[in-house]
Design a protein with these regions (language model features):
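Extreme N-terminal segment that seeds HTH/winged-HTH DNA-binding domains in transcriptional regulators
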Residues: 1-36
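Phosphate-bearing ligand-interacting subdomains
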Residues: 23, 28-31, 134-225, 231
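HTH-adjacent hinge/linker in prokaryotic transcriptional regulators
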Residues: 37, 41, 46-92
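Glycine-rich Rossmann-fold phosphate-binding loop(s) that bind the pyrophosphate
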Residues: 97-98
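N-terminal Rossmann-fold NAD(P) dinucleotide-binding loop
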Residues: 101
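Short, solvent-exposed amphipathic alpha-helical segments in soluble enzyme
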Residues: 108-112, 166-169
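NAD(P)-binding Rossmann-fold cofactor-contacting core
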Residues: 111-133
Length: 232
């Protein structure tokens, strides 16, 4: 089942959207340890932002925190999941089952709650036909089923062709791990993940003694280097 768009009561800023999954991960960690409450100061210390920023971000999800008592961990996880759309079902296809693609689909952290891996594609005859993560890798010449998200894990030289194929399959959200900017029609969202760029940014800060050299989870996840996380 593919997800269908629905309206949100309040539009969240891009920095807030970037921080919310980190808050959710922190809350899930508390839950795993048997804890039921977490406050904005504790979240902020682990995330590397101020308590004020945390409260402002979470205020956009409605009123559910208790002054002096913090947030119920279960409610916090559910509110963030709803805000980010994790309470719906998403079908995901991955194109490029080389080292990176294989590692991603085999990772327990790759798919968010509600996401379902439905198809894998590659052009390598040595890869096509193999079963990975419970799915048989199909040749890229096969039709791509309609899905919510397409993930590109190919070399840069193949990225545009793959993006075109995903768009033709009526996929309007693309996560691109290939080191290549792709052109897509209006209405299609592309998010780029380029480890070499992240490493260059990190090396700059290391060499100049600036930027995200410490702090919390937002820094260690590499998010702070590419997003203005301390802003609103």
């Amino acid at each position: 089942m593919m997800a269908t768009p629905r309206l949100r009561s309040k539009k969240l800023s891009e920095p807030t959207i970037a921080r919310l999954p980190v808050y959710q991960r922190i809350a899930e960690g508390r839950l795993q340890r048997g804890e039921t409450k977490v406050d904005s100061r504790q979240i902020g210390e682990l995330a590397g932002v101020t308590a004020t920023t945390v409260r402002r971000d979470l205020a956009g999800l409605g009123s559910f925190g208790t002054r002096g008592a913090g947030y119920d961990v279960n409610v916090l996880i559910e509110r963030i999941a709803e805000a980010l759309g994790h309470d719906r079902l998403y079908d995901v296809v991955v194109v490029g089952i080389g080292n990176l693609g294989r590692a991603l689909v085999n990772s327990s952290n790759f798919l968010i709650r509600g996401a379902r891996l439905v198809a894998l594609y590659d052009v390598d005859p040595d890869v096509v036909g193999h079963e990975i993560a419970g799915l048989t890798v199909q040749p890229l010449s096969d039709p791509i089923p309609p899905a919510t998200v397409g993930v590109i894990c190919t070399p840069g030289s193949a990225a545009q062709e793959v993006a075109d194929r995903l768009v033709e399959a009526n996929i309007h959200a693309i996560l691109n791990f290939a080191p290549q900017v792709v052109t897509v029609p209006l209405g299609t969202a592309v998010h780029y993940v380029d480890f070499s760029i992240e490493l260059q940014i990190l090396m700059y800060h290391l060499n100049n003694g600036t930027g995200p050299l410490g702090g919390g989870l937002l820094h260690s996840l590499g998010i702070a280097s590419t997003n203005p996380l301390r802003g609103s």
